[in-house]
Amino acid sequence: MRQLISPEALRAFRQSVQGSVGFVPTMGALHAGHRSLIERSRQQDDVVIVSIFVNPRQFGPQEDLSRYPQTLDADLALCEAAGVDAVFCPTAEALYPRPSDRSTGVQPPAELIQSLCGRQRPGHFQGVATVVLKLLQLVQPQRAYFGEKDAQQLRVIQRLVEDFNLPIAIVPCPTVREPDGLALSSRNRYLTFEERSQASGLYRALRAAAECFQAGSRDSQELVAAATAVLATTPAVQLEYCDCVDADSLQPLTQIPDRALLAIAARVGTARLIDNLTLQGRRPIIAIDGPAGAGKSTVTKRLAQQLGLLYLDTGAMYRAVTWLVQQQGIDPQDPIVLAELLAQADLQLRSQPAADGSEQLQVLIQGNDVTAAIRTPTVTAQVSAIAALPLVRQFLVEQQRQLGQRGGLVAEGRDIGTHVFPDAELKIFLTATNAERARRRALDLEAQGLTVDLAQLEAEIRDRDRQDSERAIAPLCKAEDAVEVLTDGLSIEAVTDQIIRLYRDRGLGDSSPQATPGQTPSPLSLG
């Protein structure tokens, strides 16, 4: 691991590395929450860079800049243990060679900084946006990782990247909590033992409001009242604000639609703590990841049918783009022409009732129903090459996320739960032993009249797993909060029923497994 002090050294390091770069900006005093960001980057990126910089321009005159925890040696040890490739530890003079009144800064949109912490900390988000833009320009990562605990900061940075057309994916990462729910924060170390015992009241307050929301309340005053009632029992917690705002614009809400951000800030002793929860009124999302041959496609389709959810056929989306490329006669290896095509593409998935009463997926692109056309041999022959293109992947992930805003779907892939739908209500990692997956593959091949060598099949499976886990685009990885389901020896029905029980146990729905009369258990096939 390299420790870099000057921007010049960082640029030299950046020019010396190849592959995708992930970036985790921090102010030091690292804890398990920071480590989760690093581990997420380590899963997805070839090179991981962490910055440690206490940014003076995001602190107000009466704030804790002078006493912010400084634990550089411990931070470097954590980074090295987590597999970080380089840590950038600049001085304030290196990043800010001129006084603030003589240097360019970033002014975030007023709508994003007038509420929540923006009211209490004037100038804070200007300082955050300025330093983040500087760091992103220096590091030039493909991805940058930020925690959802700092929800307002995250939204400001997302808008920054959008407005400046930076070719960087901002990856939101779930809040990491103590067993009693307290969100991890570098400022937690300010708390005394007694204050620490009461600080968890912040999360209990948020949960009380969330339960009120799940019970049907959509009035923001009722939700805030439910939260503040909990804090009345924690005298050490001095509430600064508790607000319901739009999850995207951060504007205050009186009535809650399908999605909102419930945010809270309080003083506990000398520590200022913040936390939040996203209130989701939409139907749940189930994200299913896993290696090839675990039965993902088969189980996902059955789950969608039994739970009344949309089966998000990501493969059909890639096929639709392939069909469009072929119809337009463009060279998919020409990134400029491909980018123009995707910018104009209108891709829609619709759920239509089938003759047997089930739901059937209809795929439209540019207004054309291509449900049947995308299954032709011509499309099949080219879809793998098209799907491997980063521009296509980026376009379709955005399309999938837009569909996910409505909820009520189940999707499968390699990184659905970690990248496409990191906020999915239920994440499943469907897997099977190599021997079981080889056996299933052998059965499929034998049904086609082919002879097979099980040892060779197992070796091929191990090699594919390695390639899928190390690939630059959409690597196979298990989400930290995913439930692993081993499918060895289980029928499709048994696996589906197990996932439905998990779905119901989480209070996501009351659907129960519905067997078709006369149906016999079906073996899992390749997914």
UniProtKB/Swiss-Prot annotation:
Cysteines joined through disulfide linkages: none
Predominant subcellular localization, coarse grouping: cytoplasm
Region of interest called Pantoate--beta-alanine ligase, as start-end residue ranges on this chain: 1-277
Any one Gene Ontology BP term: pyrimidine nucleotide metabolic process
Gene3D superfamilies: HUPs (3.40.50.620), P-loop containing nucleotide triphosphate hydrolases (3.40.50.300), Pantoate-beta-alanine ligase, C-terminal domain (3.30.1300.10)
Bias kind Polar residues: ranges: 511-527
Coiled-coil region list: none
Residues annotated as the enzyme's active site: H34 (proton donor)
Positions annotated to bind ATP: 27-34, 147-150, 176, 184-187
Annotated binding of beta-alanine, by residue: Q58
Function: Catalyzes the condensation of pantoate with beta-alanine in an ATP-dependent reaction via a pantoyl-adenylate intermediate. Catalyzes the transfer of a phosphate group from ATP to either CMP or dCMP to form CDP or dCDP and ADP, respectively.
Protein name: Bifunctional pantoate ligase/cytidylate kinase
Organism: Synechococcus elongatus (strain ATCC 33912 / PCC 7942 / FACHB-805)
